[in-house]
């Protein structure tokens, strides 16, 4: 007995939790059945849903009663196990414990079965409702199609030809009689009435919709002396005759035949009109290609592809560029409106000269960008009035200098426009002030522009050769000749535009592609002509950047004071000593004797400190002048450039003994360290008068006397 009771007790405990789930499941099924009953289903579906809800409710109640009864029996069983005495009724109830448990299990199984059945019924009802909905939609669409067809037929009955065809018939059998046509006409007035402004539009067409609905339903209501059913039969007979279908296809066939007949004519017209647009397109492509190539190296305001009569104005010297990329010859030459009075030396084919000049400009867009930190300090400072000018020239001839434009390198051009540089009748041998770093490593060919041998025409164009003299590393392996007409750009003065406080305009065209790392204002010793000629042949093994392409030499002239202002640097030489500077800016000293210093101080172009006297500016130069321990010429600061991997120069070592004392960086000399005046190692700061700045990232140069 105890074992049985314990087993039954355990069974009751194990079977206790499912009844609530079962009851909740029945409630869920009933809740699921409730929405299904709300669907617009048929009467059978609604009855089934309602019956299933009632069955599930009865089973749920029976399960709850059995659970309560089983709970009481479990309580009696526990009391009996504790030794309490029970009355006879309680003992009878405990004896029926197994029967109650079996009934509870049966009720749960029955509930699960009815729940599954209810779910199947719900799915069936939903499918039926969906099918009925689709059927209703199809019926409605069919009725709507019938209404549209009826309106079309009633509209076509107003045509006399259609009425005649319907009365005669296609095969001799009449489709409609005159009486039937009149009935349809009366019905047409009902379904498509004239607008009555006394009624609202909704009310007026509501009556028309009722007539159409009754016609579609085929009701026996009287209308127009007949019934809707009779009218529906008449309309269906017209639909079945396929009269409007055949007529519609026949009309389409005529349209297609007409279109097919007109198609060849259109094709012939298009074929005749095709050659002209093709020619126009070809001409446009040529003009566009010419504009694209020419706009790379000149300003848009100076471009004009239409003026081909100025081809004869391309009288410039022949430019030979080794290792150059060949470009296609240009079809049209741009117009050059500005006059330039230069002296032509050699005459050749204008097309060949223009091609070579453009090849030179295409390769002179160098990638170097060794800009000094001192050049980036004061970008918006105006030109210091203390910047000294070079020796003047005799203003007998004026050479107009146009604005140097290089749109591929810098977005702005800060050069002054149309500065006039007076030139003496005799050609002068002046240093070429450019930003090319190979200017300090090249050999001795001179830059000798000639201005008095012949008189160039007034409209000699040099705008196409106004590019920056910044050479690419690919060009440094061979010598190249630069035309003399392209060199006056180095005399461009920048006094009218804001410059750096250091006096160097890094935004100028020579400084846009690569920034100079040398100071152009080193003192040049007064040497005689034989020494210069001797020194010119001394470094022939080095890299030669030749700027002398003239077939004959011209005489040299002297620079006069207060006329020529340069941006990179100003040179003050002695009035009584003509100084000859090679085109590569190098003047090596004598190998046997010391370097004689000139009595004339040399200034750089950087600003002087405020408050100083005008005559004492030479003393503030930290690395120029006779008082700062400067010994030797340019060769004292020339690096060997012994096949540096980043420079691209392939120079051989020079014959003269030179000391470079740890001052080489990729083959480029960085900058002169700011020196001092006569009073100490560092003098007054230049520029805006601020404290001296450290030489950021630049190795210090130790100046040594060259023997």
Swiss-Prot record:
Protein name in the entry: Caprin-1
Keyword Acetylation (UniProt): yes
Processing and modification events after translation: Tyrosine phosphorylation by EPHA4 promotes interaction with FMR1 and liquid-liquid phase separation (LLPS) for the formation of a membraneless compartment that concentrates mRNAs with associated regulatory factors. O-glycosylated (O-GlcNAcylated), in a cell cycle-dependent manner. O-glycosylation by OGT inhibit ability to undergo liquid-liquid phase separation (LLPS).
Residue numbers carrying Asymmetric dimethylarginine: 696
Pfam families associated with the record: Caprin-1_C, Caprin-1_dimer
MF terms (GO), sorted A to Z: ATP binding; molecular condensate scaffold activity; molecular function activator activity; mRNA binding; RNA binding; signaling adaptor activity
Induction statement: Down-regulated by exposure to trichloroethylene (TCE) and dichloroethylene (DCE) in fetal heart.
Tissue-by-tissue expression: Expressed in hippocampal and neocortical pyramidal neurons, but not in Purkinje cells.
Start-end of Polar residues biased regions: 431-443, 572-603, 641-655
GO biological process, one term: regulation of deadenylation-dependent decapping of nuclear-transcribed mRNA
Coiled-coil regions listed in the entry: 58-92, 123-151
Key words of the record: Acetylation, ATP-binding, Cell projection, Coiled coil, Cytoplasm, Differentiation, Glycoprotein, Methylation, Nucleotide-binding, Phosphoprotein, Protein synthesis inhibitor, RNA-binding
Subcellular location: Cytoplasm, Cytoplasmic ribonucleoprotein granule; Cytoplasm, Cytosol; Cell projection, Dendrite; Cell projection, Lamellipodium
Glycan attachment positions: 642, 647
Disordered, as annotated region: 1-48, 325-347, 412-443, 523-558, 570-620, 641-707
UniProt biased composition (Low complexity): 1-15, 22-43, 326-335, 535-558, 674-684, 695-707
Subunit structure, as described in the record: May form homomultimers. Interacts with G3BP1; interaction is direct and promotes stress granule formation. Interacts with G3BP2; interaction is direct and promotes stress granule formation. Interacts with PQBP1. Interacts with DDX3X. Interacts (when phosphorylated by EPHA4) with FMR1; interaction with FMR1 promotes formation of a membraneless compartment.
Region G3BP1-binding, residue ranges: 358-379
The organism of origin for this protein: Rattus norvegicus
GO terms for cellular component: cell leading edge; cytoplasm; cytoplasmic stress granule; cytosol; dendrite; glutamatergic synapse; intracellular membraneless organelle; lamellipodium
């Amino acid at each position: 007995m105890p074992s049985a009771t314990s087993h039954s007790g355990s069974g009751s405990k194990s079977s206790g939790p499912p009844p609530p789930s079962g009851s909740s499941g029945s409630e869920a099924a009933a809740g699921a059945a409730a929405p299904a009953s709300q669907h617009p289903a048929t009467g059978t579906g609604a009855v089934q849903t309602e019956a299933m809800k009632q069955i599930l409710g009865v089973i749920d109640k029976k399960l709850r009663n059995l659970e309560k009864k089983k709970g009481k029996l479990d309580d009696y069983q526990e009391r009996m196990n504790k030794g309490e005495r029970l009355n006879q009724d309680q003992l009878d109830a405990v004896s029926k414990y197994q029967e109650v448990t079996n009934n509870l299990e049966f009720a749960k199984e029955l509930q699960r079965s009815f729940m599954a059945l209810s779910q199947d019924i719900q799915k069936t009802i939903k499918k039926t409702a969906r099918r009925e909905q689709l059927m209703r939609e199809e019926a409605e669409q069919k009725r709507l199609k019938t209404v549209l067809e009826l309106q079309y037929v009633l509209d076509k009955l107003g045509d006399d030809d259609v009425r005649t065809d319907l009365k005669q018939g296609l095969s001799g059998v009449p489709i409609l009689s005159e009486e039937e046509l009149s009935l349809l006409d009366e019905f047409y007035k009902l379904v498509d009435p004239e607008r009555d402004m006394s009624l609202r539009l909704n009310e007026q067409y509501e009556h028309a919709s009722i007539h159409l609905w009754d016609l579609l339903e085929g009701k026996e209501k009287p209308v127009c002396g007949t019934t809707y059913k009779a009218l529906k039969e008449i309309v269906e007979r017209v639909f079945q005759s396929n009269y409007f279908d055949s007529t519609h296809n026949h009309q389409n066939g005529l349209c297609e035949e007409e279109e097919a007949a007109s198609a060849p004519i259109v094709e012939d017209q298009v074929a005749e009109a095709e050659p002209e647009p093709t020619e126009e397109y070809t001409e446009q492509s040529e003009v566009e290609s010419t504009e694209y190539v020419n706009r790379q190296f000149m300003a848009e305001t100076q471009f004009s592809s239409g003026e081909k009569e100025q081809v004869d104005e391309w009288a410039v010297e022949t430019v030979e560029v080794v290792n150059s990329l060949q470009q296609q010859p240009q079809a049209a030459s741009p117009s050059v409106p500005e006059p330039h009075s230069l002296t032509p030396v050699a005459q050749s084919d204008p097309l060949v000269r223009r091609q070579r000049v453009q090849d030179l400009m295409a390769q002179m867009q160098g990638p170097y960008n060794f800009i000094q930190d001192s050049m980036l300090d004061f970008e918006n400072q105006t030109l210091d009035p203390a910047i000294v000018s070079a020796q003047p020239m005799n203003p007998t001839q004026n050479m107009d200098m146009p604005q140097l434009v290089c749109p591929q390198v810098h977005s702005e051009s800060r050069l002054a426009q149309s500065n006039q540089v007076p030139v003496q009748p005799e050609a002068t041998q002046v240093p070429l002030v450019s930003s090319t770093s190979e200017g300090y490593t090249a050999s001795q060919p001179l830059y000798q522009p000639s201005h008095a041998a012949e008189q160039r025409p007034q409209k000699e164009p040099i705008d196409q050769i106004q590019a920056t003299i910044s050479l690419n590393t690919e060009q440094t392996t061979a010598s190249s000749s630069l035309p003399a007409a392209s060199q006056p750009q180095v005399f461009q003065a920048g006094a009218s535009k804001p410059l750096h406080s250091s006096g160097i305009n890094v935004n100028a065209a020579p400084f846009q592609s690569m920034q100079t790392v040398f100071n152009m204002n080193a003192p040049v010793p007064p040497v005689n002509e034989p020494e210069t000629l001797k020194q010119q042949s001394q470094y022939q093994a080095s890299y030669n950047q030749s700027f002398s392409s003239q077939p004959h030499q011209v005489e040299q002239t002297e620079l006069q004071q207060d006329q020529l202002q340069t941006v990179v640097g100003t040179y003050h030489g002695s009035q009584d000593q003509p100084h000859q500077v090679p085109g590569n800016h190098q003047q090596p000293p004598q190998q046997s004797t010391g370097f004689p210093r000139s009595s004339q101080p040399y200034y750089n172009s950087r600003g002087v400190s405020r408050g100083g006297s005008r005559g004492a500016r030479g003393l503030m130069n930290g690395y120029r002048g006779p008082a700062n321990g400067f010994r030797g010429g340019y060769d004292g600061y020339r690096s060997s450039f012994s096949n540096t991997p980043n420079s691209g120069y392939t120079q051989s070592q020079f014959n003269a003994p030179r000391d470079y004392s740890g001052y080489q960086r990729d083959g480029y000399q960085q900058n002169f360290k700011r020196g001092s005046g006569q009073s100490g190692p560092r003098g007054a700061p230049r520029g805006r008068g601020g404290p001296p700045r450290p030489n950021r990232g630049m190795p210090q140069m130790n100046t040594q006397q060259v023997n």
